[in-house]
Amino acid sequence: MDYDAITALRDRHPAWRLLRAGNASLVLSFLGEFFVEANRGACPAGQVAEALDNHLYALSAGSGESRYPKEPRAYLEDWAATDAGYLRRFYPPGDDEVHYEVTPAFEKAYAWVVNLQSRSFVGTESRLHTVVALLRQIVHGTEVQPDVRLAELRRRRAELEAEIAAVEAGDIAVLDPTAVRDRYQQLSTTARELLSDFREVEENFRLLDRAARERIAAWEGSKGGLLEELVGSRSEITGSDQGRSFQAFYDFLLSEQRQAELAELIAKVSALDVLEADPRIRRIHHDWSEAADRAQRTVRQISEQLRRFLDDQVWLENRRVLDLVRAVESIALEVRDAPPTFGLEVDEPGIEIALPFERPLYQPPTEVAVESHVSAATEEVNADLLFAQTYIDQARLADTIRAVLPEDSSALLSDVVAVHPIEQGAAEIVGYLALNEDDLAIDVDDTEETVLEYPDPADPDITKRARLPKVTVRRR
């Protein structure tokens, strides 16, 4: 970084302003303990003010003098002001109370101050192993040659087999206390840095939303172009390295198996006698889950707020259209009694308008290939079935019923058939059911059945049965 860039950071960056502030000790001690160390997200102003009041009381009681005379809420408003930027002050959706949460700039300043403390032990071995492991992952993860990958996998297998053989022989190599403390120190540092990174991810999403709102407010093009640009911006964030990394981390936390493994490993590490376990590390996996959920909730809230913002813009545009329509109607009412004189009269009743684009484009006719060759029939077809059709004379059936039934009477179809047996098979039964005469009615009762017997027209020696609902014939 050059001189001008460093000067700009000193003048504008909230973290640098905080370190130069006169009450930096109060800001760092309270906000660091309340938000960072306790892994709190956005909290109501009343809760934060009450905690700050207790903190100020403890400071005054310890020193015997009141060094901070202002009210707690006044301090919170000062820290959330634009020229400070240590706190974010906002109203959550559906809540009328102000909420506060620390900004990523504050977390950077707080982490820098925490790292200023002298450490009794500075481990380097574990970080060296981490660097080497990352280099191996990058090199072998980008290798496309199968023989090189196979050689690396065989090398790992040989190391595992040698380690298994040593354990089976009773030679178990364990980490010494120094190596354990070295790795635990790196674990603690990395775990805390992850929590700070989540707040920065949230802030990046908010900056994206703010830029989107600014584009909407100043947009002069079509709605389609605006939506395309907004969706493109969202896709860029989701598909960026940061977006993909965050989504992969969140998917990892959602796995119950990985959560159980993390909890088991943390419990075993915290139980080691050679360590002074950090209390926050015992539940760090829960803190990660809460921080990731906050980031996801922020994305959902931003999407919902952006949708409502677009709806409001559409409503305003529709309102403008309605205002213009009403203005035209008002002018029409004003000139209704005194219409303006025509400046030009045309004898034609109307003007025929022919727009060029109304004419369809030329489409060549579709050529259909017709094969006129017809193959001669070679199969012998038995045409007897065509001449063996049975004709049912429904007039004869109606006369049969009239001969059996007097007027205003009824009888079962089975009784009619008993008097005049069926001669033409099932087709004759269907003919009875299909009668449509003015003085005859056919009623079918599906709740009961009847069986009609009739000789087979093709072979009178064979008797067939037809099962059908109960049929009543009425004559009017």
From Swiss-Prot:
Coiled coil: 147-204
Presence of keyword Coiled coil: yes
Entry's induction text: Constitutively expressed in all growth phases, part of the MSMEG_1276-phd-doc-MSMEG_1279 operon.
InterPro entries xrefs: DUF3375
Record key words, sorted: Coiled coil
Protein name, entry field: Uncharacterized protein MSMEG_1279/MSMEI_1241
Native organism: Mycolicibacterium smegmatis (strain ATCC 700084 / mc(2)155)
